[in-house]
A protein has these predicted regions:
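Sequence context surrounding c-type heme c attachment/ligation sites in exported
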Residues: 3-6, 24, 31-154
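Hydrophobic membrane-insertion alpha-helices, especially the h-region
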Residues: 8-24
């Protein structure tokens, strides 16, 4: 009887622990922002890393647009591949845990979109269609920037 009680307590603690981890995985480390958006609270170095990644996405988008404008498919491929899923592969798990699920989902879907743009360009998809794909990806950037801000918690 005593071992059943201990087993029940252990199981309960396990379930509570999993629930807490799931809550933080979904919610991330957030607080009310200063401008109506939700602030994601990060350490300064983590914030810098996320902003650097965002600038990389913006630079890749510019490269796609320049390539499209010049009819340079190789440039479109190079620019979009630079921002694909491979560029997000080495993100620190501790940082990922601090990011809300929606933020992570939007970010990862933009990286996936960049890979899809590269595949489309490699497959000979016409430039107007590439531009539509790029516009769809940028819509996600706008949605994310409309909902979230990065804070160092100070």
């Amino acid at each position: 009887m005593k071992s059943n009680k201990i087993a029940s307590i252990a199981l309960l603690l396990w379930v509570v622990t999993i629930a807490v981890f799931a809550w933080f995985f979904i919610r991330g480390n957030t607080t009310a922002g200063t401008d109506g958006r939700t602030a994601v609270v990060l350490q300064p170095a983590e914030r810098d890393l996320v902003l650097t990644e965002m600038r990389g996405l913006l630079s890749s988008t510019q490269g796609i647009l320049e390539g499209a404008n010049q009819g340079d498919v190789a440039r479109i491929i190079l620019a979009s591949r630079a921002a694909g899923m491979a560029s997000a592969a080495d993100v620190n798990p501790a940082l990922m845990a601090k990011l809300p699920l929606e933020f992570k989902s939007l970010g990862m879907s933009v990286h996936h979109d960049m890979d899809e743009i590269a595949k489309a360009a490699e497959g000979g998809t016409p430039v107007p269609e590439i531009l539509k794909m790029t516009s769809k990806a940028i819509t996600k950037c706008v949605a994310c920037h409309s909902a979230w801000q990065l804070s160092t918690g100070s």
